[in-house]
Structures are given as structure tokens and as C-alpha cells.
């Protein structure tokens, strides 16, 4: 029997406190697991880097021509210079998404192989976040259906990569 208070794990036989080196995750007293905060932060950073790089590759490289054609046809986008000045919003959004993405994974991971968990989690999060957002944008804005499909496919690939990274970093070390 144990309890966690301010990052310290207390049990009947004594206490163990690691300051900020571990985070205690508990599920209604069913199971307690101590997770290395460095791994959690590492997974968040990896997810952020994947999300940011994928965003650049998808929107600037892969779909850049599509967006220019839409602008030339009269679709309302901010001028590129104005978007660059608001890039901080993308960083904040990507950071928040990465933190929550990894935190939810860490809270719900199971004692199963990490590769399958990472892939399943990426698919689940795509269905939970990317697909509804893309379909709502398709309904509200005059968007080509191919663009929406590209967003969904790119989101699926990105979130699977993020899921694999989080699962790989947060997996328990194998017993030697």
C-alpha cells in the first residue's frame, strides 16, 4: 500500500522521494507505476519535433502548390509575411498537442509490445482529432475534397510516427 504526495512515493515500509526525477501515475489504486520524468519530457520533445517537421513538410512542401493555386483562385489566406509573424501560434499549438498526446499515452499504456501500442494510439488519435477537424473544415470552408483527404493521410502518418516515438521512449526497459 502506498501513496504519492508531491512526487514522493510513500509506502508502509518507508518513503522514497526523487524530487522531479519521477512522476507517479495511479489508476484508482489499482496499479501504481513510477515513470521517469526525463523519459516523459523526452517523449514530449520527440513528439513536438515530429509534429513541427511534419507540419512544415506537409504544408510547405507537399501541399504548398495546392495552397498557392487556392490563393490565386481567390481563397482567403493570410499573406505569407503575416503568417510568419504568427508562427508562434503554431509552436504553442504543437507544444500543447505534444504534451497532451504524450500524457494521455502515458496514462493509458498497457503491458503490451510498444510498436503495436504506438501504431494503435496514432490511429486512435487521428480518428479523435484529425478526422473530425478536417471534415468540419470541409463542411464550413470551400475546400477541395482531395485537400481534406491529404490532411487526413498526412495526419495519420504524423500521429503514427508520434505514437511510435512516445511508445519507444516510454517503454519499460527489457529485463536482462
Question: Residue spans of the language-model regions?
Answer:
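Extreme N-terminal basic, low-complexity initiation segments
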Residues: 2-10
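Short, Lys/Arg-enriched N-terminal segments with co-localized hydrophobic residues
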Residues: 17-34
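Juxtamembrane/disordered regions of integral membrane proteins
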Residues: 31-176
